[in-house]
């Protein structure tokens, strides 16, 4: 598998901090966490809006390979977490959340107790190359 590359063309380093930005410029901003609904802690992952004259980078993420290797490769399982999560959350680790009403799922952070009243799925993510200069994430739920 090929290594996942940063904007400079260098392989991602496990434990390093990276901003996830859209590949279109100008475009929306990077990723951050916010409060939604009746949350008292900002545990919902959002893409920030574009700022008029500057890039809105959002908050840095850390990628951790799940396999025995120390490499972060395309199409292999990784954990994704915000480097500096809010202190009220269990962690900055990503998970999938559903409110039982909508047909779509969203990305949150922390643990199930951070999303009381919601269905949560924990698991890993894969990073897939899309075109020449972009990547997308997919989710791999833990099977019980």
UniProtKB/Swiss-Prot annotation:
Gene3D superfamilies per UniProt: 2.80.10.50
A Pfam cross-reference name: Kunitz_legume
Keywords: Disulfide bond, Glycoprotein, Protease inhibitor, Serine protease inhibitor
Signal sequence region: none
Site (Reactive bond for elastase): 66-67
PROSITE patterns: SOYBEAN_KUNITZ
Keyword Disulfide bond: yes
Cysteines joined through disulfide linkages: 41-88
PANTHER family per the UniProt record, alphabetical: KUNITZ FAMILY TRYPSIN AND PROTEASE INHIBITOR PROTEIN, KUNITZ TRYPSIN INHIBITOR 2
Note: On the 2D-gel the determined pI of this protein is: 4.56, its MW is: 16992.79 kDa.
Record's protein name: Kunitz-type elastase inhibitor BrEI
Upper classification of the organism: Eukaryota, Viridiplantae, Streptophyta, Embryophyta, Tracheophyta
